[in-house]
Amino acid sequence: MKKITLIGSELAKTGNEFIYLGPLEECEPCRFKRICHNNLDIGTRYKIVSVRSANHPCSVHENGVKVVEVTPAEFTIIIESKKALEGVTLTHSDVQCDRVCCENYLLCHPEGVSGKYKVASILPEKVDCKKGNSLKKISIVPVQQ
């Protein structure tokens, strides 16, 4: 589902992704506050699908903001093999691992994944887990609640 919001003009490029972290104190008096913040869910990763040309003033972004259309971003994570079934809806939980230097750590503990998501596809790449866990790399899409 597409949503309308505002984003810094320098960041407003089709295809860019961002994780919405919530409003800042400086946003309180702004007349665009509702457009910027009311359509987005904190902690969700979004992808910009279109950018409008008009530029609007903003006290946070030096070069102003642009109106953009966004959708929840599809992205890749790693989960336990037994949970990796295409089309299934799951509630996210990180893989239990504390090896922060592991090449897979960021995919096992992804930022911007919260709540429920749908397994869009199971990727064919083999995941090598140093702890011996049976893992799969998958592509996911957040489920709108």
UniProtKB/Swiss-Prot annotation:
Pfam families: UPF0179. Belongs to the UPF0179 family. This is UPF0179 protein MMP1679. It comes from Methanococcus maripaludis (strain DSM 14266 / JCM 13030 / NBRC 101832 / S2 / LL).
